[in-house]
Amino acid sequence: MNIEIIRAEMRREDEKNYVGNTVFRAEGEKSVYEITFMSKNGKDWDYSLHFTEQSGDEEELLRMDELLENDDDMYNQLLDAALDAYPA
């Protein structure tokens, strides 16, 4: 599935934790999503997915979440966008 990255950012909190997010639109989807990434070591990542602009259909959100769980390339593309935005 093709995705359009709208914006991304990454920052460190307390010199330990990483927090970042990527706002994106997936091909064929009406909604714009934001995925927030969190890591304590910069290697193992948790995420939270939500709608960006306004609430949408819960089924649509669950389908996107399942897609992210099963499509490593898409997940990594979104994470890489956030990591690339981290100031060196």
Task: Please tell me what each predicted stretch does.
Residues 36-88:
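Acidic, low-complexity intrinsically disordered segments
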Residues 1-32:
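Short, charged/polar N-terminal "headpieces" of proteins
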